[in-house]
Amino acid sequence: MEWIRKYHIAIAWMIATSAMLISLFFSEWMKLPPCDLCWYQRMAMYPLVLILGIGMYRKDPRVSMYAFPFTCIGLILSVYQITIQAFPINEMKICSVGVSCTEDYLNLFGFISIPMLSFIGFLVIIILIYIESDRETKE
Protein backbone atom coordinates (compact mmCIF):
# COMPACT_ATOMS: atom_id res chain seq x y z
CA MET A 1 0.00 0.00 0.00
CA GLU A 2 2.94 2.30 0.67
CA TRP A 3 4.10 2.13 -2.95
CA ILE A 4 0.60 3.16 -4.11
CA ARG A 5 0.86 6.22 -1.87
CA LYS A 6 4.31 6.98 -3.26
CA TYR A 7 3.45 6.49 -6.94
CA HIS A 8 -0.27 7.37 -7.04
CA ILE A 9 0.07 9.98 -9.81
CA ALA A 10 2.28 7.67 -11.89
CA ILE A 11 -0.28 4.86 -11.56
CA ALA A 12 -3.10 7.25 -12.54
CA TRP A 13 -1.02 8.36 -15.54
CA MET A 14 -0.47 4.72 -16.57
CA ILE A 15 -4.22 4.05 -16.38
CA ALA A 16 -5.00 7.14 -18.49
CA THR A 17 -2.31 6.21 -21.02
CA SER A 18 -3.54 2.61 -21.19
CA ALA A 19 -7.13 3.80 -21.68
CA MET A 20 -6.01 6.10 -24.49
CA LEU A 21 -4.03 3.36 -26.25
CA ILE A 22 -6.82 0.79 -25.84
CA SER A 23 -9.44 3.18 -27.25
CA LEU A 24 -7.19 3.91 -30.22
CA PHE A 25 -6.64 0.17 -30.69
CA PHE A 26 -10.41 -0.46 -30.78
CA SER A 27 -11.11 2.34 -33.25
CA GLU A 28 -8.04 2.25 -35.50
CA TRP A 29 -7.01 -1.41 -35.62
CA MET A 30 -10.22 -3.24 -34.72
CA LYS A 31 -12.24 -0.75 -36.84
CA LEU A 32 -14.92 -0.33 -34.15
CA PRO A 33 -16.35 3.16 -34.73
CA PRO A 34 -16.81 5.11 -31.47
CA CYS A 35 -20.20 6.62 -30.71
CA ASP A 36 -20.64 10.25 -29.71
CA LEU A 37 -20.53 9.53 -25.97
CA CYS A 38 -17.35 7.49 -26.50
CA TRP A 39 -15.82 10.52 -28.21
CA TYR A 40 -16.78 12.73 -25.25
CA GLN A 41 -15.26 10.23 -22.82
CA ARG A 42 -12.09 10.26 -24.92
CA MET A 43 -12.08 14.07 -24.71
CA ALA A 44 -12.06 13.70 -20.93
CA MET A 45 -9.45 10.90 -20.80
CA TYR A 46 -6.85 12.00 -23.37
CA PRO A 47 -5.93 15.31 -21.66
CA LEU A 48 -5.33 13.36 -18.45
CA VAL A 49 -2.32 11.74 -20.11
CA LEU A 50 -0.72 15.17 -20.50
CA ILE A 51 -1.99 16.68 -17.24
CA LEU A 52 -0.91 13.75 -15.08
CA GLY A 53 2.32 13.26 -17.03
CA ILE A 54 3.38 16.89 -16.66
CA GLY A 55 2.24 16.97 -13.03
CA MET A 56 4.26 13.84 -12.32
CA TYR A 57 7.34 15.21 -14.09
CA ARG A 58 7.16 18.59 -12.31
CA LYS A 59 6.10 17.00 -9.00
CA ASP A 60 3.21 19.47 -8.89
CA PRO A 61 1.15 18.92 -5.72
CA ARG A 62 -1.85 20.59 -7.40
CA VAL A 63 -2.08 18.11 -10.27
CA SER A 64 -5.13 16.56 -8.60
CA MET A 65 -6.93 19.87 -8.86
CA TYR A 66 -6.17 20.07 -12.60
CA ALA A 67 -7.20 16.47 -13.33
CA PHE A 68 -10.34 16.33 -11.19
CA PRO A 69 -12.76 18.14 -13.59
CA PHE A 70 -11.80 15.85 -16.48
CA THR A 71 -12.23 12.71 -14.40
CA CYS A 72 -15.63 13.84 -13.09
CA ILE A 73 -16.92 14.67 -16.57
CA GLY A 74 -15.69 11.33 -17.91
CA LEU A 75 -17.20 9.44 -14.98
CA ILE A 76 -20.60 11.10 -15.46
CA LEU A 77 -20.57 10.39 -19.20
CA SER A 78 -19.65 6.75 -18.66
CA VAL A 79 -22.41 6.31 -16.05
CA TYR A 80 -24.89 7.83 -18.48
CA GLN A 81 -23.76 5.52 -21.30
CA ILE A 82 -23.94 2.45 -19.04
CA THR A 83 -27.48 3.52 -18.13
CA ILE A 84 -28.64 3.93 -21.73
CA GLN A 85 -27.06 0.60 -22.67
CA ALA A 86 -29.05 -1.05 -19.88
CA PHE A 87 -32.22 0.95 -20.58
CA PRO A 88 -32.12 2.15 -24.24
CA ILE A 89 -35.33 4.18 -23.86
CA ASN A 90 -33.45 7.20 -22.43
CA GLU A 91 -31.05 7.72 -25.34
CA MET A 92 -30.23 11.38 -26.12
CA LYS A 93 -30.67 13.01 -29.52
CA ILE A 94 -26.89 13.23 -30.06
CA CYS A 95 -26.76 9.45 -30.03
CA SER A 96 -29.31 9.15 -32.84
CA VAL A 97 -26.86 10.18 -35.60
CA GLY A 98 -24.11 7.76 -36.64
CA VAL A 99 -23.15 4.92 -34.33
CA SER A 100 -25.70 4.24 -31.59
CA CYS A 101 -24.51 4.82 -28.03
CA THR A 102 -26.44 1.73 -26.96
CA GLU A 103 -24.35 -0.55 -29.21
CA ASP A 104 -22.36 -3.01 -27.11
CA TYR A 105 -19.25 -4.06 -29.06
CA LEU A 106 -17.43 -5.64 -26.15
CA ASN A 107 -19.15 -7.68 -23.48
CA LEU A 108 -16.82 -9.54 -21.12
CA PHE A 109 -18.39 -11.79 -18.48
CA GLY A 110 -21.83 -10.53 -19.47
CA PHE A 111 -21.51 -7.08 -17.88
CA ILE A 112 -18.14 -5.49 -18.70
CA SER A 113 -18.64 -3.19 -21.68
CA ILE A 114 -16.44 -0.41 -23.08
CA PRO A 115 -18.34 2.25 -21.05
CA MET A 116 -17.92 0.07 -17.94
CA LEU A 117 -14.15 -0.05 -18.54
CA SER A 118 -14.22 3.73 -18.95
CA PHE A 119 -16.16 4.09 -15.69
CA ILE A 120 -13.68 1.89 -13.82
CA GLY A 121 -10.74 3.84 -15.28
CA PHE A 122 -12.15 7.25 -14.32
CA LEU A 123 -13.16 6.03 -10.85
CA VAL A 124 -9.73 4.56 -10.10
CA ILE A 125 -8.04 7.74 -11.35
CA ILE A 126 -10.27 9.85 -9.06
CA ILE A 127 -9.33 7.66 -6.11
CA LEU A 128 -5.62 7.75 -6.97
CA ILE A 129 -5.36 11.51 -7.47
CA TYR A 130 -6.71 12.11 -3.99
CA ILE A 131 -4.31 9.80 -2.19
CA GLU A 132 -1.83 11.97 -0.35
CA SER A 133 1.77 11.00 -0.82
CA ASP A 134 4.25 11.03 2.03
CA ARG A 135 5.83 14.16 0.55
CA GLU A 136 2.51 16.04 0.63
CA THR A 137 1.70 15.03 4.20
CA LYS A 138 5.14 16.12 5.47
CA GLU A 139 4.89 19.60 3.91
Swiss-Prot record:
Q: Which GO terms describe its molecular function?
A: protein-disulfide reductase activity
Official protein name in the record:
Probable disulfide formation protein C 2
GO annotation, biological process: protein folding
* Membrane spanning residue stretches: 6-25, 40-59, 66-83, 110-133
What domain of life does the native source organism fall in?
Bacteria
Annotated InterPro entries: DiS_bond_form_DsbB/BdbC (IPR003752), Disulphide_bond_form_BdbC (IPR012187), DsbB-like_sf (IPR023380)
- Report the sequence similarity comment from the record: Belongs to the DsbB family. BdbC subfamily.
Q: What does this protein do?
A: Required for disulfide bond formation in some proteins.
* Primary site of residence: membrane
Q: How does it sit in the membrane?
A: Multi-pass membrane protein
Its localization reads: Cell membrane
Matching Pfam families: DsbB (PF02600)
**Disulphide bridges, residue numbers:** C35-C38, C95-C101
Q: Which organism is it from?
A: Bacillus cereus (strain ATCC 10987 / NRS 248)
**What GO cellular component term, any one, is given?**
plasma membrane
This protein's UniProt keywords: Cell membrane, Chaperone, Disulfide bond, Electron transport, Membrane, Oxidoreductase, Plasmid, Redox-active center, Transmembrane, Transmembrane helix, Transport
